[in-house]
Amino acid sequence: MRIENSKYPHNWGLSPCKGREMDSEMDKVLTVIVPVYNMEKYIRQCLGSLVIGEVLERIEVLVVLDGSKDGSAGIAYEFVERYPDTFRIIYKANGGHGSAINTGLMMASGEYVKILDSDDWVDRDAFCRLVDCLETGEADVVWSNYYWVYEMNGEKAIQYRDPFTDVVYGKKYRFEDIADRTFIKMHSMTIRTELARQAGRKIDENCYYVDVEFVMYPITEVETIIFLDEFVYMYRLGRSGQSMSMEQMRRNHRNHEQVLKSLLAFYDEQKFRHLDQAHLDYLEKGIARVVSSHFKIYLSFPCSGKVFAMMKALDEKIREEYPDVYKKVENKVVWAIRRSGYLLYYPGHFCMSLKEKKA
């Protein structure tokens, strides 16, 4: 891809970056990958939240412009000009969120890596403490919490206060000791860059809902984890066109199904590796969560025999080919539908419709 704009002194393809080349002696503790596609309304807040004097020299921010056509590039360039030792821009053809993450991972120089979506931002004080924790280099993954922040009124909400009961914050745990007690989401995860690269599988490109792939693929290599009692990530909710809205999930349901298929294929690969039981159980539990989400999408569609048949066929395939994943589904609605021979699909759809109308 070529950039024809006199404001930019070079033309960039996939690999070249604007920003000072990172000196091998300038060790970066953390690389923050910011995938960007047409986010000029939000990107200044996102990047600005990372401009923190205490950590600027210790972090690298890779702004991956994924074929963005609005003014996002110009805003990002302002940060490169002011902080060339921290901010870098990577231009690439549009390939979706996963493609931007894959590209960022290739270019990352930090010991750890974190994904920050360009419509989200970080809490400055909490982010500083995260970087301080990472600098010790003690664990493969550092977990930190996040707020949901509603676009309409700025109110914050939490999904859960603690990752599990009786967690000891700051303690280094063996992953196998806590694998059955928690589930890590992308917004909470900061992981060693080398482990993220060693996953052996690229994140799906031209596809939504790949956050779970970023977590699940490298988790099989994770041995240690520290839980940090900080709300670092500010996750914006209610933005128009947001992929996690139910309307968008219906529209992109095939993307969601593709992610599920990719995770099942990865699970097959890991079984042949004779993965230890704790990691295998974690994979099964994580994929089961995606199965539950897919049921939710089916239930949100207008009621039809076609949707009923699709839901039933997929679930029966999982029961026959992935029985351990099937059994790890915890959602009570899914199990009620299963036990009814899928006949509760119809009242389930009705309840889902009412819930969506109230939202």
Regions found by a protein language model. Give the residues of each.
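Catalytic core of nucleotide-sugar-dependent glycosyltransferases
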Residues: 232-239, 245-274, 293, 297-322
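Short aromatic/hydrophobic "clamp" motif used to bind/position activated sugar donors
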Residues: 113
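Short beta-strand/loop segment that forms part of the nucleotide-sugar
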Residues: 58-68, 88-93, 118
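A conserved acidic beta->alpha catalytic loop
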Residues: 49, 65-75, 96
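Glycine-rich, basic loop-to-helix element that forms the pyrophosphate-binding segment
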Residues: 92-108
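Donor-binding/catalytic cores of nucleotide-activated saccharide
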Residues: 97-98, 118-226, 233-250
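Membrane-interface aromatic/basic loop that binds lipid-linked glycans or pyrophosphate carriers
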Residues: 2, 12, 299-359
